[in-house]
Amino acid sequence: MSNIYRDVTLNQVSEQDIGKTIRVAGWVENIRDHGGVSFIDLRDMYAVMQIVIRDGKLLEGIRKEQAITVEGLIEKRDEETYNPKIPTGTIELDAKEVTVLGEVYSQLPFEVMTSKSVVHEDVRLKYRYLDLRNQKVKDNIIFRSKVISYLREKMTSMGFLELQTPILCASSPEGARDYIVPSRKFKGKFYALPQAPQQYKQLLMVSGFDKYFQIAPCFRDEDARADRSPGEFSQLDFEMSFATQEDVFAVGEEVLSSVFEKFAPEGSVVTKAPYPIISYKQAMLEFGSDKPDLRNPLRIIDVTDFFQKCTFKPFIGKTVRAIRVHADMSKGFHEKLLKFATGLGMGGLGYLEVLEDGSYKGPIDKFIPDDCKEEFRILAGLEVGDTIFFMADKEERAAYYAGMIRNELGEKLDLIEKNAYRFCYVNDFPMFEKDPETKKIGFTHNPFSMPQGGLEALNTMDPLDILAYQYDIVCNGVELSSGAVRNHDMQIMEKAFEIAGYDKEVLKNKFGALYTAFQYGAPPHAGMAPGVDRMIMLLRNEENIREVIAFPMNGNAQDLMCGAPNEVTEQQLREVHIKVRD
């Protein structure tokens, strides 16, 4: 679209325009003086073009990052000056007129071209509008837009309706801490920002909508991690009526496989449907985590029963896990791995090496009776050249230690599969867990999940033995999504909440809409919600999720650019009946 500022965008200029006078606009990325002739690298959202300045007066007052418009003649570059790194690398614009549209009044806080690699994150976030001019940063946000557009197209093509749910809702006692919003009209009462559209999407199913989705903003007052942005995040939220766990799996596979195959870097391998399904119990045993990274070929085995027959006291009465590795490892490697293990809190890291003659070498060898060594070789699948590491503690800690050692071995021995996106489902999560401090029973995952075995299981089984129809999608060790078959039966819901310490009145008060709606013919329904930010982080090979969000908070949940959270006036506080206490 041509206007007073530009005739075309920079990516639209080509060798076909040689000899034409055109007007372009953008930002001054760089200025180079070659003695009598100067060059400006002009950047807009789409490309970079070289501007030739032969009249020195045109360059007066021109500085980096000014917004300018330039009119001039498109010329062919000398062949020896071609720049194959940019689309306009064979042409340049001989400037006849340069006009500053947006002045730079202050010294730039950093060099835009190198901000992503050399500038501290807090400085980048304070001046995010400058940081976003960096092409690598901008490309992440453009990529994000394309992925979200594709997700919408895909879901719509599969018969899902895109529906929006409220941002101001009621606080409820599950999940992370709520962000709460005081009411002006109702003294002492509060709204909450939704941690997820959980209740609303279930109510849509009760309302008779068959398949719903939205790119949902979610708000949780929780600490940041590399794969978790504090404050808010986005998820592809979807729900289906009259659906089973397997139906949700099929949709998840179709959507994620297609988006990763379309947007993953060239040459990447993406898991084909159907994805492997790993139970929570199996995941904790074989991978030491409920977020298994299947790119790592190492597996954990349980050798607890075997070591109860041995005389190694540190293993007696404990859960013992082991990892078999076939690789050459120096003394220095073992020392570094031991240091890593003790840094986790382990008292040591026992190991055995299998020698050429089939005998063992290592600090634990003497504690394994000779008549048991063949049994152990078969149990662990040991071969000549193998090394096997041992982790022993209470079951939960042993699993954690084994998982961390598995990850460290995979990384340090370069065993992780390259250019691959390995998906799996983790299912059969425990419905309930016991708080180690209070000893009270609570929900493990989602309180609205259907327990396996229904009401009979709730009435007859130990709560800690009950499994739920809950599931996660994991990719490369990152939890992309959680979901569940929902508990749509009032009797089952009341009993489940009773076990978790909530009486019927709490259920009515905190989840009143669901409680009431489920008395009017609620259909079976199920769904999940893959995280959009995490999806894009994986596709862009970024280590920090904030790199794929346009205006993220920093790790302390602060918006350094706009100054949130900030103080408000006494009048504003009075209007919402709030008094700040020291």
Predicted stretch roles:
Residues M1-D582:
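Class II aminoacyl-tRNA synthetase catalytic cores and aaRS-like
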